[in-house]
């Protein structure tokens, strides 16, 4: 993990963490609270999942569960955890097999194959549950294999408790009043939230989920376009009792906000960042939050979504451009 001051990093793992916080200024009309984004899009492989890729592999090594050059790592993922594991596996010498719903962006497939990870696509109608089942099926017939289990692995929230939470506290000079985070595995809000609550019991925690798959709000799982959150079940690592409120955001809202963040803030981020921002802005408009500071997690960089609906219009424009004489 990244230290405060570093000359030349000994390897890529020392580049993880210590991502910046930045205020949102031009998409916050009507807000009575300030909103600052934690740019996890600036991790070495462009997402918050770089943290848990490091944490889960390191934890398993320390427990003697896996060994480079011998163990085969397996993980079901919507993509970013796969990438976080893929660069770690490449750096440490592991074979990695990823199972992923075929509905996830093409960029994810290309990046995973770029790290020479083996990729098995699963039925998108079965969501993450289908990817999990396929991972278990592969493990049963693969010697020396180990599933890292991001949805159940305590090393997931642990790294956020040890790094993300402290970074938010220090970066805000201890003035953070609330944290808003999309819920995929639940590791980010659980680990970061627990740390922030220990520093200030009054810190509010807001989870974000798709309105189309509002499990935490008592709804049913359903298809949506916010890749990375709304897995359709309540993950084992998520401590639901920590959360003060769950804010629902639609796929359309999330996509539009992600576009606005690029156009008005100069922040090229993914759809789940748009969802988190939309939710944080809703919270920042509530009268009881006047004068407060809300930190929102932006999980990933927009370039990973070029083939998705987020960039559909500009992609078509780019494809149809002609050469000027």
Curated annotation (Swiss-Prot):
InterPro entries: Cys_synth (IPR005856), Cys_Synth/Cystath_Beta-Synth (IPR050214), CysK (IPR005859), P-phosphate_BS (IPR001216), TrpB-like_PALP (IPR001926), TrpB-like_PALP_sf (IPR036052)
A GO MF label: cysteine synthase activity
PROSITE patterns: CYS_SYNTHASE (PS00901)
Keyword tags: Amino-acid biosynthesis, Cysteine biosynthesis, Cytoplasm, Pyridoxal phosphate, Transferase
Cofactor: pyridoxal 5'-phosphate
Gene3D superfamilies per UniProt: 3.40.50.1100
Reaction(s) this enzyme catalyzes, per UniProt: O-acetyl-L-serine + hydrogen sulfide = L-cysteine + acetate
Top-level taxon of origin: Eukaryota
GO biological process: cysteine biosynthetic process from serine
Keyword Amino-acid biosynthesis found: yes
GO CC terms of this entry: cytoplasm
Modified residues annotated as N6-(pyridoxal phosphate)lysine in this record: 49
Location, primary (coarse class): cytoplasm
Ranges in coiled-coil conformation: none
Pathway info: Amino-acid biosynthesis; L-cysteine biosynthesis; L-cysteine from L-serine: step 2/2
EC assignment: 2.5.1.47
SUPFAM superfamilies associated with the record: Tryptophan synthase beta subunit-like PLP-dependent enzymes (SSF53686)
Residues that bind pyridoxal 5'-phosphate: 80, 184-188, 272
Cell compartment(s), UniProt: Cytoplasm
Keyword Amino-acid biosynthesis appears in the UniProt entry: yes
Database matches in PANTHER family: CYSTATHIONINE BETA-SYNTHASE (PTHR10314)
Protein family: Belongs to the cysteine synthase/cystathionine beta-synthase family.
Subunit comment: Homodimer.
Protein name, per record: Cysteine synthase
Species annotation: Solanum tuberosum (Potato)
